[in-house]
Regions:
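A compositional/biophysical signature of low hydrophobicity enriched in polar/charged and small residues
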Residues: 1-106
């Protein structure tokens, strides 16, 4: 086990909006990546953060109370570091969410 967690109903803690933020960059050097990663890790709204292959370079899963708070988050993100493109999709409905791992591959 890495750690034990409590699963909290995000609606009850005013985090009803889920945003998936795709980021493209023209910068692919270590100095830029380090600054970007450190900046994103400081942002409490980001609950998942991935470096990707394909059309986008990074994907963030962000929890916020509403669109106005997302706009504040977006401005904070884009002021931290130079990004080529930021595209956001908002979840309309959560169909499945789990932290349980698929252990049938062991």
């Amino acid at each position: 086990l890495k750690k034990k967690i409590a699963v909290i109903d995000r609606q009850k803690v005013n985090l009803s909006t889920v945003a998936f933020v795709q980021i493209k960059t023209s910068q692919h050097n270590m100095a830029w990546a380090k600054k970007f990663v450190e900046g994103v890790k400081e942002m409490d709204e980001v609950i998942e953060f991935y470096r990707l292959s394909g059309a986008s370079d990074y994907l963030l899963k962000v929890l916020i109370p509403n669109i106005e708070k997302f706009d504040e988050f977006y401005k904070k993100l884009t002021n931290k570091i130079d990004l080529s493109d930021v595209t956001t999709s908002f979840a309309m409905e959560e169909i499945k969410q789990t932290s349980a791992l698929p252990l049938n591959y062991i």
